[in-house]
């Protein structure tokens, strides 16, 4: 619907269409009394998305106007549903007074709720960051900026390749993504729900610099270290303007922008984040992830920080040791228990402060802030007993703020209502004038009780009652049977079926006074509420620093608790390349097993750069590889790790090529996905990388797969010298350690008992003797007849060779042997190899010929 032809509509509908034209890409919630109404296509769309009734109102061009509505008091629930579906909503409120308005009451859009810019508690997942992001691209690479409006955290980066950009998108998982209308790499963002197409000019670099310096109150951006990041700044400028447009208010909590440099991080590509299941499992849930084991934080803001740490391990050994020292101090003193108990009272201070900055904080937000401030002295006392530099530094930032605490204690009642609209939030004694107006309003009940008693007794009307409603105000009600007793000065106001209602001058005078006092008390309370924000906002930076310190204290105390409870050890960080793990365990798998986890060692160093891992399917190869990567990652987060001892050098990247499935959306087969991930590793791994390669070459023919696996292993070992765990079912690869330096064979052990198999899950030196494939198939429930036939076919393949067995599928001996890719020599071939015809007599030669004939 356009704004053309407005004259054919009612004044109210004309107003709606004008406002809708200014907000074409959002659902417009148009306030009408106690409801938000939607019209035209918005109504149709909302009825489908929210499962609400679609009705009609008036007409347009002879056609009824579609309409849908929802009660204003239930709007949060509906907004939550829309935001989860990536839909933005413009909230249009009545700002004029209906009593004084000529025509439609004035309305305007007061805020735009979008998936990435919501700050309302009811619309957010408390333990996950909610980011709005912008992406930009030119010939040199990508620019990427993210903003968490609920904390003010503003970051930018400049990924150079498509793979790096995809990794950033997966790491940050934005709820909303802005992109320029000329963006060409749409396939990398199509999976994101809340994408927003923006004009190219919104990414203008000069405009971006101007926007950012204005926001931060600086002359330039040199102090933030982002002056030369032109691609990133283009994205950041568009992002900041979008947030300003949607919030319609100042953003004082966004005080800086930070360059997210990959030089200081252990880089994890998209496949690695997915395969290691850091915060999301392969099914898209949270269960059985690393975060599900490690996250026992006391506050939502601590939980979010821990997840950021897991997704961005760091290389700075000094910073890592600061974290490890703090965890050790909490663990050794046992203070993590008491600290966690105090932190539980802190709530989500970080997001409360964001709502304060946006002036959208609710009464219970400030009550929770008061509770947090009241807990700071107790926390300070606990931290004072721990002599550790990092904890001491954090304690300074989270020091008590007595003056702010006292202000909130004076201002807010103990249990305030949800919203300020109806008053009753500010405490008695906070403001003398407010107390006076409240006393006038509160005195109404006694006056009415006295009036009712007096009138009833004076006129002998026992059915007389004094009441009030919103339409008629105060009234005296007399039953129909006694209405003839009403005095002459009673003025009839309303007639009901069984009663009459009257007004008298004294009651009217009191009504005016009461309504006036209530109105003035409410108006004054709302004014004082806004002034309370003005008193708190100058302390915003200090409060944000405290929230940041409390978040880190929460994570460190939590990791100390996890280390103590789960028997983790402190990793030793060195400058030498290598990974030495004694009795390592998988942090997630050991928590879900009913029996004890079998711990295993890992040793990778200059003279042992690659482990060729063989063993039966289900024997634990993938678990062993993943646990090594997770232990390495946890060490680079600054956490204790599940092992008896760990010594690890600095890593630059962790790669995983584990498992694969079809990427139907991109038209890529399983094998194509596998080869793409392999190519990424071979191009980008270095001697400081940890590489996990699991079953390369499964998705193609046997010999193609073996060739690719062999060549990939050679390249990783010789050209890159990366620390590599290379699991394979190609036993031919176990020859590599005898042909090249720096490689070793290990295997996962298993024991067969007749037709049954027992997995030992223990890593042993040397190659596996067999694959146990048929035993695993039997364990999986494959029909016995199929297993029997497979054994026969296996024997034929071993005996006659691959091609001959295919040509004669029915001639299958029944002896059980182990399959290898390149068949071992047959008995005849081995016998012939030992024969020396020059040393044989004719009789011996004839006998040997008969013997060989018998072997066939």
UniProtKB/Swiss-Prot annotation:
Keyword line: ATP-binding, DNA damage, DNA repair, DNA-binding, Nucleotide-binding
Annotated spans, Disordered: 798-817
Cellular component aspect of the GO annotation: cytosol
Binding site for ATP: 615-622
InterPro entries: DNA_mismatch_repair_MutS, DNA_mismatch_repair_MutS-lik_N, DNA_mismatch_repair_MutS/MSH, DNA_mismatch_repair_MutS_C, DNA_mismatch_repair_MutS_clamp, DNA_mismatch_repair_MutS_core, DNA_mismatch_repair_MutS_N, DNA_mismatch_repair_MutS_sf
SMART domains: MUTSac (SM00534), MUTSd (SM00533)
A Pfam family annotated for this UniProt entry: MutS_V
Residue stretches of biased makeup (Polar residues): 798-807
Gene Ontology MF term list: ATP binding; ATP-dependent DNA damage sensor activity; damaged DNA binding; mismatched DNA binding
GO biological process, one term: mismatch repair
Role, per record: This protein is involved in the repair of mismatches in DNA. It is possible that it carries out the mismatch recognition step. This protein has a weak ATPase activity.
Record HAMAP family: MutS
Stated family: Belongs to the DNA mismatch repair MutS family.
Official protein name in the record: DNA mismatch repair protein MutS
